[in-house]
Amino acid sequence: MSGKANASKKNAQQLKRNPKRKKDNEEVVLSENKVRNTVKKNKNHLKDLSSEGQTKHTNLKHGKTAASKRKTWQPLSKSTRDHLQTMMESVIMTILSNSIKEKEEIQYHLNFLKKRLLQQCETLKVPPKKMEDLTNVSSLLNMERARDKANEEGLALLQEEIDKMVETTELMTGNIQSLKNKIQILASEVEEEEERVKQMHQINSSGVLSLPELSQKTLKAPTLQKEILALIPNQNALLKDLDILHNSSQMKSMSTFIEEAYKKLDAS
């Protein structure tokens, strides 16, 4: 015991004399602690792995029934893997486009995950039905894009038709306004014309026209009919012919037609 005490005293004296050696010893102690911690972690990890192995073993028991079906499974096609790669790259670019911290570490981590996933997809086998769904993704995407394009074109045509209808409506509104202005102008012109007619005929308050009186000479003058008959030698025969023509059915129908026409004109 005295030898161990002397050795510890010597070590203490050496550490006091050489502080650098003291630092090295402290680092050694820290490294030993790290090793112990890692060993403990590895032990726990092994326990977890053993539990996971047990669960996997039970899952394999349940999956033995589907082993015959797995024989028909097929690996993923190259086009599907390429499509998956492009999708992942676009997602990575979208994530990295945002202003985030530690961008390089995130990029490295995402690229590593992408690489791991693509490596798994190279050996992955899927059922034929799922394979058809995966291979039809690009065609379905193209169909949806074509449908979206058709919808956009239809919307553009509808917008053009709406613009044309709006333009025609504006033109019709302008025409209606111009017609209203013309009607107002015509109404004012009609009022002015009525005023002129009133001034010309000098209509009094009773509504009777104040026309100039006819002279006695004009009243005693022969009528135009008498003057015309005086020029015809056989007046009686002409009067009979005129009477027959006046009482004929053609003349009566013509007179009724003229009366109806006048009635319609008066009604309008």
Swiss-Prot record:
Alphabetically ordered keywords of this record: Centromere, Chromosome, Coiled coil, Nucleus, Phosphoprotein
GO CC term, one of those recorded: nucleoplasm
Region Disordered, residue ranges: 1-80
A UniProt-annotated Pfam family: CENP-Q
Listed Basic residues bias regions: 58-72
Modified residues (Phosphoserine): S31, S50, S249
Source organism superkingdom: Eukaryota
Location of the protein in the cell: Nucleus; Chromosome, Centromere
Coiled-coil blocks: 170-206
PTM comment text: Phosphorylation at Ser-50 is essential for CENPE recruitment to kinetochores and orderly chromosome congression.
Any one GO BP annotation for this protein: chromosome segregation
Annotated function: Component of the CENPA-CAD (nucleosome distal) complex, a complex recruited to centromeres which is involved in assembly of kinetochore proteins, mitotic progression and chromosome segregation. May be involved in incorporation of newly synthesized CENPA into centromeres via its interaction with the CENPA-NAC complex. Plays an important role in chromosome congression and in the recruitment of CENP-O complex (which comprises CENPO, CENPP, CENPQ and CENPU), CENPE and PLK1 to the kinetochores.
Protein family per UniProt: Belongs to the CENP-Q/OKP1 family.
Subunit structure: Component of the CENPA-CAD complex, composed of CENPI, CENPK, CENPL, CENPO, CENPP, CENPQ, CENPR and CENPS. The CENPA-CAD complex interacts with the CENPA-NAC complex, at least composed of CENPA, CENPC, CENPH, CENPM, CENPN, CENPT and CENPU.
Name listed for the protein in its UniProt record: Centromere protein Q
Organism: Homo sapiens
